[in-house]
């Protein structure tokens, strides 16, 4: 393996036109690799700190020159000479250099860019694809794509409270077949929306953002689109939600569909939805601080539904350990920029899987062409990936990378399919 010779960084744009950090790492053997950092719209209060400039006269305060400078002036010089293959040592050195609990001094966006670029450089130097370098010789499982095809909440300007309505092609035989099913359903939905005179404009993650009366209307439209595309709702293509309920939680109540609801009332709502629609997964059904509500919900419906903690856990092993102890969820959403280093991300996935939980690798609403999470999904044997609709090139880039990985694996490739959702009884 080769040592790190130099680290560079620059300010680039994400899919929402906001600045983000891109890092390049040069190794002593001449290898040059780069990584770009995503950014979220609905962010958990406990996420690692995203360092922005705050200068309203430049990019409306969202510039990342401070984070770029942190890479160039502090992080780079501190890790030069380290072996690129010593990922944990590199990441721990950055954490120590930052010296804060939430990476506020150097910025999680600066640290993550370096962490991912180092991993890519090590893989490139070893002449291995990233999924193989990180996952070892047994990495061979392609994830089920959780495709967000109707956007609401913080990802769209509509009257729908739930942030994401997803389709999951669990009945397909291969990843490429599952992707095709999702694409055909997506186009079927677009035609259906047009026929009903509804808006076909896109939200941040490539899904449609029609004005609808209520959340169930979105589920009904998707079910109809699945059938019109020639697939069976439930057994071939199931449904998933990201409620992002922290966005409408205030003073101990959920302001949902025009009513103030308790955690128990939200739990009853989800139970009713699951009884009427083929739901396999609900993300952030309750708020990030409602530990008691989460534990109650998991006890009520966790045996038949995947309950995913995003804002609840923020990819943080410490918060995940608390959730495991309280039995607050049965799955974790994994976003690399929530925690800020690859090592901590992999630690969170490992802890979840050892504890009998599932893990879902996820993009952010502000993405780039970087495809790292596609490789991570295969490397960690997560069996699930959430990376938007099959539209907008920053989303499609991840799907295309998974197609390449499937092709490279050849006959060894296995599609997770229904096995990724062992609790689903439909």
Swiss-Prot record:
GO terms for biological process: glycolytic process. Mg(2+) binds at residues 242, 283, 310. Its main location: cytoplasm. It is found in: Cytoplasm; Secreted; Cell surface. It is an enzyme of class 4 (lyase). Coiled coil: none annotated. Pathway: Carbohydrate degradation; glycolysis; pyruvate from D-glyceraldehyde 3-phosphate: step 4/5. Its cofactor is Mg(2+). It catalyses: (2R)-2-phosphoglycerate = phosphoenolpyruvate + H2O. Its EC number is 4.2.1.11. Catalyzes the reversible conversion of 2-phosphoglycerate (2-PG) into phosphoenolpyruvate (PEP). It is essential for the degradation of carbohydrates via glycolysis. Belongs to the enolase family. NCBIfam families: eno. This is Enolase. It comes from Leifsonia xyli subsp. xyli (strain CTCB07).
């Amino acid at each position: 393996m080769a040592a790190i010779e130099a680290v560079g960084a620059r300010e680039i744009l994400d899919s929402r036109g906001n600045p983000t950090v891109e890092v390049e790492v040069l190794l002593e053997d001449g290898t040059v690799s780069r990584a770009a950092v995503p950014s979220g719209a609905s962010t958990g209060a406990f996420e690692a700190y995203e360092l922005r400039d705050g200068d309203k006269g430049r990019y409306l305060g969202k510039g990342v020159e401070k984070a770029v400078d942190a890479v160039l002036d502090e992080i780079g010089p501190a890790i030069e000479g380290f072996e690129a293959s010593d990922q944990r040592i590199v990441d721990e050195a950055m954490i120590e250099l930052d010296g804060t609990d939430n990476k506020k001094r150097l910025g999680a966006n600066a640290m993550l860019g370096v962490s991912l670029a180092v991993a890519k450089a090590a893989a490139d130097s070893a002449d291995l694809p990233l999924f193989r370098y990180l996952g070892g010789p047994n990495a061979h499982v392609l994830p089920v794509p959780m495709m967000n095809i109707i956007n609401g909440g913080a990802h769209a300007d509509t009257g729908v409270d739930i942030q994401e309505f997803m389709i999951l092609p669990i009945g397909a035989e291969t990843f490429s077949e599952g992707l095709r099913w999702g694409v055909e359903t997506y186009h079927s939905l677009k035609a259906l929306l047009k026929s009903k005179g509804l808006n076909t404009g896109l939200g941040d993650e490539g899904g449609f953002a029609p004005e609808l009366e209520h959340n169930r209307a979105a589920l009904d439209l998707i079910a109809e689109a699945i059938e019109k595309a020639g697939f069976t709702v439930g057994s071939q293509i199931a449904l998933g939600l990201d409620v992002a309920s922290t966005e409408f939680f205030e003073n101990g109540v959920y302001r949902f569909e025009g009513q103030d609801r308790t955690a128990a009332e939200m739990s009853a709502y989800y139970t009713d939805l699951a009884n009427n629609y083929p739901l396999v997964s609900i993300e952030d059904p309750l708020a990030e601080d409602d530990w008691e509500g989460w534990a109650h919900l998991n006890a009520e419906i966790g045996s038949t539904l995947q309950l995913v903690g995003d804002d609840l856990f923020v990819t943080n092993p410490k918060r995940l350990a608390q959730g495991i102890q309280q039995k607050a969820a049965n799955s974790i959403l994994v976003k690399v920029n929530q925690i800020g280093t690859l090592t901590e991300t992999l630690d969170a996935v490992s802890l979840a899987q050892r504890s009998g939980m599932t893990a879902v690798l996820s993009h952010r609403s502000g993405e780039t062409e970087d495809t790292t999470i596609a490789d991570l999904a295969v490397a960690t044997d997560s069996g699930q990936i959430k990376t938007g609709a099959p539209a907008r090139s920053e989303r499609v880039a991840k799907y295309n990378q998974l197609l390449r990985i499937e092709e490279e694996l050849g006959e060894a490739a296995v599609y997770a399919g229904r096995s990724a959702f062992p609790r689903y009884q439909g």
